[in-house]
């Protein structure tokens, strides 16, 4: 038994900040940002627009897309690095917004790899027979973690949420396989310099960009090769490749190493920037809305995030 995605939805806050606007208060310019990242703009949530609020909007779109009653959902998993509160979880707040009394809900924190981790967890829970319909969300207000004077990081991130409905599959569609990994020895490559038990603050993002670029390509490449090999697939079998939308140079280098044709690679980083755990479900929602996906298509997800955490998932639509 496996599970399949029966609906998806994405939400981006209405406020858009272009590179030119960013250059008014940061020592940067549009050419510098585009050349190094491929990003032209990012969406930024308002001061009173929290992660749970943007998660709800993405969830409602996924529920509508799946054409199910909200009461069919029997578990909620929210992948996030930027919760509203230290506790309770975003997922339980979302459960309350949706009126799903007693439905178990929890947050999963694997930073930018969170959605891939969430896919594996949700698939395992549905495959066990314990749950039938899971709402899985990646939602982030990454701009709350930015030092707006650090041009190496503040140009990279945006806010947004993406959501999917996963349900038991009775045919050959659904999650084929996935893998997840972590390496705590590399945590200083990307982290925040704050935390509840450290100094009582959320901190700001600290990143070693060159090291992260190299490891991102290396780790995702290894993860994908292993996943394809273990399931007797080749790159030629892939119809759409949806990598984490962190940086177009990482995406292009990974696609080059894998020899994936460019028209199969989904790229939303230019307009979305890096939305961490929301980036893959947002990209999936964008692809689905384009009408290009057809039943039977093979889709590959891959992501890497702080931790380090990384992994990939293979599914048949």
UniProtKB/Swiss-Prot annotation:
SUPFAM superfamilies: Thiolase-like. It catalyses: malonyl-[ACP] + acetyl-CoA + H(+) = 3-oxobutanoyl-[ACP] + CO2 + CoA. One of its GO terms (molecular function) is 3-oxoacyl-[acyl-carrier-protein] synthase activity. The active site is at residues 112, 244, 274. One of its GO terms (biological process) is fatty acid biosynthetic process. Keywords: Acyltransferase, Cytoplasm, Fatty acid biosynthesis, Fatty acid metabolism, Lipid biosynthesis, Lipid metabolism, Multifunctional enzyme, Transferase. It is found in: Cytoplasm. Residues 245-249 are annotated as: ACP-binding. It comes from the Bacteria. GO terms for cellular component: cytoplasm. Pathway: Lipid metabolism; fatty acid biosynthesis. InterPro entries: ACP_syn_III_C, ACP_syn_III_N, FabH, Thiolase-like. Its EC number is 2.3.1.180. Catalyzes the condensation reaction of fatty acid synthesis by the addition to an acyl acceptor of two carbons from malonyl-ACP. Catalyzes the first condensation reaction which initiates fatty acid synthesis and may therefore play a role in governing the total rate of fatty acid production. Possesses both acetoacetyl-ACP synthase and acetyl transacylase activities. Its substrate specificity determines the biosynthesis of branched-chain and/or straight-chain of fatty acids. Homodimer. PANTHER family: 3-OXOACYL-[ACYL-CARRIER-PROTEIN] SYNTHASE, BETA-KETOACYL-[ACYL-CARRIER-PROTEIN] SYNTHASE III, CHLOROPLASTIC. Belongs to the thiolase-like superfamily. FabH family. The last Arg residue of the ACP-binding site is essential for the weak association between ACP/AcpP and FabH. This is Beta-ketoacyl-[acyl-carrier-protein] synthase III. It comes from Rickettsia bellii (strain RML369-C). The gene is fabH.
């Amino acid at each position: 038994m496996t599970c399949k995605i029966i609906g998806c939805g994405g939400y981006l806050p209405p406020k858009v900040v272009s590179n030119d606007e960013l250059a008014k208060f940061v020592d940067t310019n549009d050419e510098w940002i585009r050349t190094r990242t491929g990003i032209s703009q990012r969406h930024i949530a308002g001061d009173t627009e929290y992660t749970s609020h943007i998660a709800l909007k993405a969830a409602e779109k996924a529920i509508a897309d799946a054409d199910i009653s909200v009461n069919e959902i029997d578990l909620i998993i929210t992948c996030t690095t930027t919760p509203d509160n230290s506790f309770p979880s975003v997922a339980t707040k979302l459960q309350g917004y949706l009126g799903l009394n007693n439905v178990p809900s929890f947050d999963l924190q694997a930073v930018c790899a969170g959605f891939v981790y969430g896919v594996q967890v949700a698939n395992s829970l549905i495959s066990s027979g314990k749950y039938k319909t899971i709402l899985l969300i990646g939602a982030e207000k990454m701009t709350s973690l930015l030092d707006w004077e650090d041009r190496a990081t503040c140009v990279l991130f945006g806010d947004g949420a993406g959501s999917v409905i996963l349900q038991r599959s009775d045919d050959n569609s659904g999650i084929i396989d996935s893998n997840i990994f972590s390496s705590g020895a590399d945590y200083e490559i990307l982290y925040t310099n704050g935390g509840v038990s450290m100094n009582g603050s959320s901190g700001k993002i600290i990143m070693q960009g060159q090291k992260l670029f190299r490891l991102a390509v290396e780790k995702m490449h290894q993860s994908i090769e292993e996943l394809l090999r273990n399931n007797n697939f080749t790159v030629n079998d892939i119809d759409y490749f949806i990598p984490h939308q962190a940086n177009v140079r990482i995406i292009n280098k990974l696609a080059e190493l894998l020899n994936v044709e460019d028209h199969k690679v989904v790229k939303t980083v230019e307009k979305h920037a890096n939305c961490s755990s929301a980036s893959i479900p947002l990209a999936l929602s964008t692809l689905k809305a384009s009408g290009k996906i057809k039943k039977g298509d093979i889709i590959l997800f891959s992501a890497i995030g702080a931790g380090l955490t990384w992994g990939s998932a293979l599914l048949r639509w």
